[in-house]
Amino acid sequence: MTEPSTDCPFVELMEREYYLDDTKVLVEFPPHHRRILNKAFRANEEGKLPYETVVWSTPKKEGKTAIGGAIAYGWCRHYGGNAFSLANDKDQAGERMFDRVVKNLQIMREKNESLYLQIVDEGYHDRITKNNMIEFAEGDQINPSPHWLKFVPADYAGEAGGRQAFTCFDEMWAYKGDAMSRFWDEFVPLSIMPASLRFITTYAGWYGESELLWSIYDTVVKPDPHDPHIKHGTPVPELEDLPVYQYGAAYQPGSYLVYWDHENRMPWKTPAYIEGRRDDPAVKGRESEWRRMWKNEWTTGQEAFLPAELIDELMDMAESKGLVNHMKHW
């Protein structure tokens, strides 16, 4: 006998309807993804989501764009309202998360045409996108219609004053300068909507350049200088074994859930594969960029005189010889 699902309706819907573009099969989330998604999207008895902003930051090739696409699709189906795929430029806004949603619908049209005709607005049956937008049919969505997903580059003035229910900021490490700050400010979650969320996918940025992302990291994730195991944010109940942190009280305005991982958890990403990326002649002399993309660590964009591993090895060797660092907490 099959045990009843413990997933929230939002996670169940994504696994029931969202096709991956590379394999053309329905998504099946890894256990750690499933736990985080259930925590982020399990509404309370009043139907309110626990967090206004969710950050999903992992090393390269950990499925960030696929997660963003599945969530954007699921949002339009379950919560509805106006949804935006946002990015640093037009190509990135249209070719990443938004493009995954389009490909999902193309695969759905082949594999489950009746569902496709049911959920996509009649005017979009033959052509999935029009004017950078996908329109979804009226169903049992929680937010008022119209229900659509639109991709928008960083032109905040063109979309000012909208009624956004959902926004996805893709690769936020690339958001730099005052214009990007104003763009961010325009797309805040709206309390007037029954459900409204801001979702961020990214890996780490550069010190002094990725100001928006650094502000979030510094507030929620950055380790205490005296104890690296202590973060500025608080561990999330039931997720204490994962690098997931909370800022603000759940179900309250301004609340954040931040998943900031340094591990390569996909089973195909063996240590040999990761080291192979490090030994690639094309990245020779750019150790910091390898660490940023494959370890999800903040860097300056400039190379250190000595690699961190060598420094650690020398410190251990010195300690074994009786040398003690009396200022290690300074």
Predicted regions and their residues:
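Phosphate/NTP-binding elements of NTP-utilizing enzymes
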Residues: 1-330
